[in-house]
Amino acid sequence: MTPPLLLAKPLRRVTLVLGSVWLAGCALVPIQPGATRAEVLAKYGKPSAEVALPAGTRLQYSYQPAGQSAWMVDLDASGRVVSAKEALTLNEFFKIGLGRWTRVDVQREFGRPAAISHVASWPGDVLVYRWLDANTPMLFWVYLDAGNVVQRTGQGLDLPPKEND
């Protein structure tokens, strides 16, 4: 008979894998352009945030901090879907304008961060986003200066906590 303590680690891994599969199922299925706001809300529920856009409204469906996805559904002035996209991708992150974008711009494009962090070598906030790159858990950091302007970005692996952390 295998001692229970030896089963704990493999069981934890199975639980993490099953949890990841379940969370992947939380991703929005494609939303058709032309769908109404009411149809989007009926199908996906209340968004995590709404942001005014020059030509309409953005419904944000962010799964931060636990998830690795954030969907942006853009509606025109009449309340019809113009576009829907996953925001937390490398191509989207590359659009960030260093020295030009502000905290407001970042949160409009990516939704709320998973965390707001601080490091000794940086004077401002660091917005932390969890995302997937080809099924690899990643972190994306957005470094803001004291005026809330983006000065730098970075990315790295989202490593699981060690057993005793």
Language-model segments: which ranges?
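Short alpha-helical interface patches
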Residues: 90-98
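A cross-family detector of function-defining hotspots
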Residues: 32-80, 97-165
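Selective for proline/serine-rich intrinsically disordered segments
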Residues: 1-2, 8, 45, 111
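Short aromatic-glycine motifs in intrinsically disordered, low-complexity regions
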Residues: 29-30, 92
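Acidic/histidine-rich, surface-exposed loop or edge segments in extracytoplasmic proteins
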Residues: 81-91
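Bacterial N-terminal signal peptides that target proteins for export
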Residues: 2-18
